[in-house]
Amino acid sequence: MKKTAILTVLLMAAVSTSAQRKAEPYFTFRELPNMLKWCPAPPDTVGAAFAYDIMQYMWGKEMRQKDPARTAIAIRDAVYSLECIMQEFSEPLGLKMSEEETPEIFALLSDAKVTCENISNFPKFYYKRIRPFMRFHEHTATPQFEPDLRRNFSYPSGHTILGWCSALLLSEVNPERADTLLTRGMMYGESRVIVGAHWQSDVDAGRLAAAATYARMHTSERFLEQMRRARQEFRIKTGLATPEEIKAYNKKEKKKTKK
């Protein structure tokens, strides 16, 4: 009983952190790989690639009619926020995530999110690609977001970059659930086609951008330290950490607080 109480106190101290942190990108857009130099441009309006985009757009419309359960997931995925990411990926990860309960994982994902935005903004405004629902003068499954979508260009898919990069990061936090996390990450991008907000090639480019961002972040010492802290937090929260690990982590936190 006494040992359990001590471990509980140590655990609570180990995972505590200050609230309301401001997200800071690991790299600026100039420091990230330039998508214009290595990622294919969006397909023009003739040829097989664009024909496939149209076929996938029609497939998305069919899915909205045939599979209401999958469509409901796609509609949830349409909310562009870190809260949505944590909600949708908590079950695949095997741990409920939130800013309050998992502050280190939150910090990892929060800084990664703004880094992902840095890689996508320039190509979006360079290509100025029109979204499929606009080309066909139709509505998406998420009409409440259409005004914002009309002001923001289509290529690459920012939702897909965030979803796939989050899946890669969380697979590193918990490698044992990598298959499940990556499956959910693939679904997150697919959801953009299902709701009608993106072409398939937007989603494909988004996954490439996410992979490039993920690789670049691994050259940042700050990122590597935050990943270490996130993995440690996961082990503590899921009961995988040894008492020695918890004590060592708590000792380091105390030293950090004194500085």
Model-derived features with residue positions:
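Histidine-centered divalent metal-coordination motifs
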Residues: 159, 198, 206
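Hydrophobic h-region of N-terminal signal peptides that target proteins for export
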Residues: 10-18
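Hydrophobic alpha-helical bundle signature of multipass membrane enzymes
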Residues: 21-195, 216-222, 226, 232, ...
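Positively charged n-region of N-terminal signal peptides that target proteins for export
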Residues: 1-4
